Amino acid sequence: MMKLKSNQTRTYDGDGYKKRAACLCFRSESEEEVLLVSSSRHPDRWIVPGGGMEPEEEPSVAAVREVCEEAGVKGTLGRLVGIFENQERKHRTYVYVLIVTEVLEDWEDSVNIGRKREWFKIEEAVKVLQYHKPVQASYFEALRQGYSANNGTPVLPTTYSSSMSGIR
């Protein structure tokens, strides 16, 4: 299913969830520092860069496109961390690891909406996300637990609050 938004087409899965993709953008392979971007709705809050998938777009391709648009970085795409479900907002987000190899000085969202970006230690990133973006904070828990993907489907517990199923 698709819906047109003013400047984009939203895509939905069979359950009516918006299909999204995002990356945990790490400064290096040690995965100690992650890049967060300012929210377009709440510029004083930090979020993981990501967004809606285009029709017929593979999740990995969408993830790379979104981080370039939102965070102004390019890099080496790594493993799928998981597919995360936000029942409140009806989103399913494919989250990947990306090792940053190039940081653009000017990028689409910095020019168009004044979006900012900043490197955070993992613990700090979790702290700034857990209040207003608990599902995004859970990305790091899944990463830390190090569950491996089973044919692209992560094998992870669903032990998050009732307003979100956490990880599918």
UniProtKB/Swiss-Prot annotation:
<feature type="binding site">
    <location>
        <begin position="18"/>
        <end position="20"/>
    </location>
    <ligand>
        <name>substrate</name>
    </ligand>
</feature>
<keyword id="KW-0007">Acetylation</keyword>
<dbReference type="GO" id="GO:1901909">
    <property type="term" value="P:diadenosine hexaphosphate catabolic process"/>
</dbReference>
<comment type="function">
    <text>Cleaves a beta-phosphate from the diphosphate groups in PP-InsP5 (diphosphoinositol pentakisphosphate) and [PP]2-InsP4 (bisdiphosphoinositol tetrakisphosphate), suggesting that it may play a role in signal transduction. InsP6 (inositol hexakisphosphate) is not a substrate. Acts as a negative regulator of the ERK1/2 pathway. Also able to catalyze the hydrolysis of dinucleoside oligophosphates, with diadenosine 5',5'''-P1,P6-hexaphosphate (Ap6A) and diadenosine 5',5'''- P1,P5-pentaphosphate (Ap5A) being the preferred substrates.</text>
</comment>
<feature type="binding site">
    <location>
        <position position="66"/>
    </location>
    <ligand>
        <name>Mg(2+) 3</name>
    </ligand>
</feature>
<dbReference type="GO" id="GO:0008486">
    <property type="term" value="F:diphosphoinositol-polyphosphate diphosphatase activity"/>
</dbReference>
<keyword id="KW-0460">Magnesium</keyword>
<dbReference type="GO" id="GO:0071543">
    <property type="term" value="P:diphosphoinositol polyphosphate metabolic process"/>
</dbReference>
<dbReference type="GO" id="GO:0110154">
    <property type="term" value="P:RNA decapping"/>
</dbReference>
<feature type="short sequence motif" description="Nudix box">
    <location>
        <begin position="51"/>
        <end position="72"/>
    </location>
</feature>
<dbReference type="GO" id="GO:0045202">
    <property type="term" value="C:synapse"/>
</dbReference>
<dbReference type="GO" id="GO:0034431">
    <property type="term" value="F:bis(5'-adenosyl)-hexaphosphatase activity"/>
</dbReference>
<feature type="domain" description="Nudix hydrolase">
    <location>
        <begin position="17"/>
        <end position="142"/>
    </location>
</feature>
<dbReference type="InterPro" id="IPR047198">
    <property type="entry name" value="DDP-like_NUDIX"/>
</dbReference>
<dbReference type="GO" id="GO:0030145">
    <property type="term" value="F:manganese ion binding"/>
</dbReference>
<comment type="subunit">
    <text>Monomer.</text>
</comment>
<feature type="active site" description="Proton acceptor">
    <location>
        <position position="69"/>
    </location>
</feature>
<dbReference type="GO" id="GO:0098978">
    <property type="term" value="C:glutamatergic synapse"/>
</dbReference>
<dbReference type="InterPro" id="IPR000086">
    <property type="entry name" value="NUDIX_hydrolase_dom"/>
</dbReference>
<feature type="binding site">
    <location>
        <position position="133"/>
    </location>
    <ligand>
        <name>substrate</name>
    </ligand>
</feature>
<dbReference type="GO" id="GO:0052848">
    <property type="term" value="F:inositol-3,5-bisdiphosphate-2,3,4,6-tetrakisphosphate 5-diphosphatase activity"/>
</dbReference>
<dbReference type="GO" id="GO:0008270">
    <property type="term" value="F:zinc ion binding"/>
</dbReference>
<dbReference type="GO" id="GO:0034432">
    <property type="term" value="F:bis(5'-adenosyl)-pentaphosphatase activity"/>
</dbReference>
<dbReference type="InterPro" id="IPR015797">
    <property type="entry name" value="NUDIX_hydrolase-like_dom_sf"/>
</dbReference>
<dbReference type="GO" id="GO:0000287">
    <property type="term" value="F:magnesium ion binding"/>
</dbReference>
<feature type="modified residue" description="N-acetylmethionine">
    <location>
        <position position="1"/>
    </location>
</feature>
<dbReference type="GO" id="GO:0052842">
    <property type="term" value="F:inositol diphosphate pentakisphosphate diphosphatase activity"/>
</dbReference>
<feature type="binding site">
    <location>
        <begin position="39"/>
        <end position="41"/>
    </location>
    <ligand>
        <name>substrate</name>
    </ligand>
</feature>
<dbReference type="GO" id="GO:1901907">
    <property type="term" value="P:diadenosine pentaphosphate catabolic process"/>
</dbReference>
<feature type="binding site">
    <location>
        <position position="66"/>
    </location>
    <ligand>
        <name>Mg(2+) 2</name>
    </ligand>
</feature>
<comment type="similarity">
    <text>Belongs to the Nudix hydrolase family. DIPP subfamily.</text>
</comment>
<protein>
    <recommendedName>
        <fullName>Diphosphoinositol polyphosphate phosphohydrolase 1</fullName>
        <ecNumber>3.6.1.52</ecNumber>
        <ecNumber>3.6.1.61</ecNumber>
        <ecNumber>3.6.1.10</ecNumber>
        <ecNumber>3.6.1.62</ecNumber>
        <ecNumber>3.6.1.59</ecNumber>
    </recommendedName>
</protein>
<dbReference type="GO" id="GO:0000298">
    <property type="term" value="F:endopolyphosphatase activity"/>
</dbReference>
<feature type="binding site">
    <location>
        <position position="115"/>
    </location>
    <ligand>
        <name>substrate</name>
    </ligand>
</feature>
<dbReference type="GO" id="GO:0005737">
    <property type="term" value="C:cytoplasm"/>
</dbReference>
<dbReference type="GO" id="GO:0140933">
    <property type="term" value="F:5'-(N(7)-methylguanosine 5'-triphospho)-[mRNA] hydrolase activity"/>
</dbReference>
<feature type="binding site">
    <location>
        <position position="70"/>
    </location>
    <ligand>
        <name>Mg(2+) 1</name>
    </ligand>
</feature>
<keyword id="KW-0963">Cytoplasm</keyword>
<dbReference type="GO" id="GO:0052840">
    <property type="term" value="F:inositol diphosphate tetrakisphosphate diphosphatase activity"/>
</dbReference>
<dbReference type="GO" id="GO:0071544">
    <property type="term" value="P:diphosphoinositol polyphosphate catabolic process"/>
</dbReference>
<dbReference type="GO" id="GO:1901911">
    <property type="term" value="P:adenosine 5'-(hexahydrogen pentaphosphate) catabolic process"/>
</dbReference>
<feature type="binding site">
    <location>
        <position position="50"/>
    </location>
    <ligand>
        <name>Mg(2+) 1</name>
    </ligand>
</feature>
